[in-house]
């Protein structure tokens, strides 16, 4: 069953001290049964998907209503590009380093209506055919309005082992566990993603989160959350 614990990642102890979760120990099916017994109309309501507050409209459509469209190129980068052959040093900084793309790194395979409508790892909405496997967004250049894509979910440009969080964006739900020493945790970088083994490395101006195995589609601006024994203890905005 899905857990909403990840969504509580920015709360603090003062807030949690006065918060009750009366159905926190129940499965979703049990809650629906109780609602049905009480005659609540929401008992059979479908689960919400995406952003609840935008109403009955998809997120891309919602954004296009609010943001101006602007034509730009979609550049496909081959899986065999030389940049992917380089082995990073086994340091947090090197493992967290992002691939830097330029138009010369690939071929233009289509156009889009605005790089700001796309995010790393996105597959839908590209409207580019002719490939054996689906295309995924590797990176977006909002300044130049270019989207870089790669073919297949195993494209090396999708994967990194580490990420960086600026100190101002580091939030400890359990500040008593904060430490300057490397700390073994479990972590996730998106809602409902399985927890993965990782290490926290505190630096003077921020923190590295280094996973044991490469993670797909680490997107700047999203939240990373870390756990101890399935307890959510901290989070931060990915830089």
What do these predicted regions represent?
Residues 141-233, 238-239:
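Basic, glycine-rich polyanion-binding accessory segments appended to enzymes
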Residues 24, 29-171:
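Anionic-ligand-binding alpha/beta catalytic cores of soluble enzymes and soluble regulatory domains
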């Amino acid at each position: 069953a899905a857990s909403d614990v990840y969504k509580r990642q920015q709360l603090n102890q003062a807030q949690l001290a006065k918060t009750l979760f009366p159905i926190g120990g129940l499965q979703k099916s049990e809650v629906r049964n109780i609602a049905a017994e009480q005659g609540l109309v929401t008992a059979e309501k479908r689960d919400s998907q995406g952003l609840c507050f935008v109403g009955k409209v998809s997120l891309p459509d919602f954004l296009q209503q609010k943001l101006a469209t602007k034509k730009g190129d979609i550049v496909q980068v081959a899986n065999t590009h030389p940049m992917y052959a380089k082995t990073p040093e086994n340091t947090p900084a090197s493992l967290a380093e992002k691939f830097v793309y330029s138009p010369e790194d690939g071929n233009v395979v289509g156009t889009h209506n605005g790089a700001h409508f796309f995010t790393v790892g996105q597959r839908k909405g590209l409207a580019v055919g002719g490939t054996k496997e689906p295309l995924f967004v590797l990176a977006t250049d909002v300044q130049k309005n270019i989207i870089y894509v790669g073919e297949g979910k195993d494209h090396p440009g999708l994967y990194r082992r580490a990420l960086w969080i600026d100190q101002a964006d580091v939030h400890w739900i359990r500040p008593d566990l904060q430490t300057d020493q490397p700390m073994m945790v479990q972590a996730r970088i998106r809602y409902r993603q399985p927890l993965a083994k990782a290490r926290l490395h505190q630096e003077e101006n921020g923190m590295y989160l280094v996973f044991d195995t490469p993670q797909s589609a680490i997107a700047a601006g999203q939240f990373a959350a870390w756990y101890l024994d399935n307890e959510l203890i901290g989070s931060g905005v990915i830089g």
